[in-house]
Amino acid sequence: MGKALVIVESPAKAKTINKYLGSDYVVKSSVGHIRDLPTSGSAAKKSADSTSTKTAKKPKKDERGALVNRMGVDPWHNWEAHYEVLPGKEKVVSELKQLAEKADHIYLATDLDREGEAIAWHLREVIGGDDARYSRVVFNEITKNAIRQAFNKPGELNIDRVNAQQARRFMDRVVGYMVSPLLWKKIARGLSAGRVQSVAVRLVVEREREIKAFVPEEFWEVDASTTTPSGEALALQVTHQNDKPFRPVNKEQTQAAVSLLEKARYSVLEREDKPTTSKPGAPFITSTLQQAASTRLGFGVKKTMMMAQRLYEAGYITYMRTDSTNLSQDAVNMVRGYISDNFGKKYLPESPNQYASKENSQEAHEAIRPSDVNVMAESLKDMEADAQKLYQLIWRQFVACQMTPAKYDSTTLTVGAGDFRLKARGRILRFDGWTKVMPALRKGDEDRILPAVNKGDALTLVELTPAQHFTKPPARFSEASLVKELEKRGIGRPSTYASIISTIQDRGYVRVENRRFYAEKMGEIVTDRLEENFRELMNYDFTAQMENSLDQVANHEAEWKAVLDHFFSDFTQQLDKAEKDPEEGGMRPNQMVLTSIDCPTCGRKMGIRTASTGVFLGCSGYALPPKERCKTTINLVPENEVLNVLEGEDAETNALRAKRRCPKCGTAMDSYLIDPKRKLHVCGNNPTCDGYEIEEGEFRIKGYDGPIVECEKCGSEMHLKMGRFGKYMACTNEECKNTRKILRNGEVAPPKEDPVPLPELPCEKSDAYFVLRDGAAGVFLAANTFPKSRETRAPLVEELYRFRDRLPEKLRYLADAPQQDPEGNKTMVRFSRKTKQQYVSSEKDGKATGWSAFYVDGKWVEGKK
């Protein structure tokens, strides 16, 4: 009798499952997806593993045929798709096919969400054979008991869930491949659009505009320091004057109030004592885990999901992509037993705490929890420190969610002083309850003990402290709060949040600074154009409804191709109109805002333009016929608009107060340096609003305050410049093109040696040859055709020795390093980011041996890393 083949999608998951299955099973990994829609027009070849069984036809030589070839899916012919084995996965597929031929049965044990279902379906389609040979097994946690139960009751592939995943993929493909070329034509090359990503960018853009339109308003608060009859200190805040909320808007009003308060008599009007409770939060779902990891651990969404994936695959937590707060009965019994044994009965509620899941959540799924509550974070020796921290957070939330409420005695004191009312609030913890395992992030102002005073007691004024404040604009999104907003609006699902957050940053429409989102100007322009021409596509409710439609497909409540057809019909109508000229209702181009600045080359006026790389000045003569065209541009150096995280929550308000306001629409203006004598202030709503101002004076680029830098090649001074990739130092000698980077710490990068061509060393992945380059992370070999070929690798010491005479003097010591370790393994040059020094190490079969040598006091010394 042969063995059964079990296929999972990750090697780590395969390793864990293998521990629980006997010798009758062979567990192998597909290493993620094995096939997908083509990345180029190669779909025209229609590979043998296509989902279609029709005879391959020669593609028509028209635009539609070419588009279908590129997309790999044909929305005009019943959504016929052409899947291809992913590059590099041929060997994996071949091995799985060979194992499948020998296997008695094949178990598809990929993840339990739609993505996992789709991977399982692709595996079955590619491997082939009788469908009866395949079984689908799913489990919420990788434990011995869960694995045994899953294999005792295997099921079949859920084709509805597969179709829901395909429908999402096809819609995203259509939008990306059909709208992006329109953006290239109308706005700028290299732009892209996405069905969900563009809506997420809209959220960031709208928040950016709310912030720029916000005008901070001044207001004042007055605190009073008093003492009680027994001499205890009592801090109060003025809340009312003449029974109206106290909110003076300037210093004069505040001083008038202070004068009255200084003469008033203070007495306690009311003391209110009442018990309050604080209930624990629900166990984590994907979005709340991402938010808690951001707030408590400082993790980004991508890092959180990567750590959670590793914990799941190692068997330590349940599946991490879920929107259900449901807990299995076994899990509830387990944690209640743990609470009773370790904290006592007073921490255990009479009945389990229940939490409501949102509408459309997958109740069959569980919340994210530890597989075994008795396993502590410190015992996860095979996990990295960040994974242990995330596990501890999940463990704490799981245990806390089934504990009793925390109990407090809350006190409110109301004090009278003439026409004024003052208040003080305090809270005393009487029973810690769930906070014993999940402490609060920080104590609020109420978490203080108020002195024992009663109604009628007189207080003595010690000091009045007026403080100026300004109203704050809406807070910028963090990764976690953007996920929360997407979830609230029903956009995306647990399995897509992380990819949405990553994609909108990769596209260059937004950026993250100090863990907060900023909209790029091109992101604003693209959002405006898409909103004007694709209202449904950019509509929050429509996007949420489409998510619901996909849920219906997964639940066998809707036919997937009917959903796609309805979407495509509306979409193509909008696309056809958008492709027309603006006069006919088509998409507006990326217009220039003309200025009074003269072109230094031809004298025509320069205009404010926006490209993917940022805002710049371009000559209006660029629109002329080729022979008359002027291509002159002027780089604009943006003022440092990134907020200093150390400034705290007032940073955004302070930045807005410092900005100029557009004379036409009142929006905060963005400021740029044209040259050392001119600064350009551009309306934050540019190019929709053409407001701008030119300021003259003496200016310089912020970013380098060190000593004068001398060019190492010609001896001239180097000055700070701003380019498409940021700030750099450039030689002032026009004949010398030398430049040097500005490092993150603000220092000028040390001089780098010129590349050394090594035509004797051919590249493996192209016809190029290697050159030896000196970079920020030491020397490395790179293709001479960069960026066409991006092949790089570390140089072998024996290679450097071979070409020692070509190396600059500064690098020749590397050629003198040991060429082999004591075991005869070849050595290569590496760079330590910790010490900023180069060293050599050896490898065997692609893995580090642990041997290394370091250059110390003019000689090479062997030593362990």
UniProtKB/Swiss-Prot annotation:
Region annotation (Disordered) ranges: 37-65
CC cofactor note: Binds two Mg(2+) ions per subunit. The magnesium ions form salt bridges with both the protein and the DNA. Can also accept other divalent metal cations, such as Mn(2+) or Ca(2+).
NCBIfam families reported in the protein's UniProt record: topA_bact
Biotech and industrial use: Has been used to construct a 2,4,6-trinitrotoluene (TNT) biosensor strain.
Pfam families: Topoisom_bac, Toprim, Zn_ribbon_bTOP1, Zn_ribbon_Top1, Zn_Ribbon_Topo
Renumbered residue ranges of the record's region Interaction with DNA: 192-197
PANTHER family membership: DNA TOPOISOMERASE, DNA TOPOISOMERASE, TYPE IA, CORE
PROSITE patterns cross-referenced by the UniProt entry: TOPO_IA_1, TOPO_IA_2, TOPRIM
Binding site for Mg(2+): E9, D111
Protein name: DNA topoisomerase 1
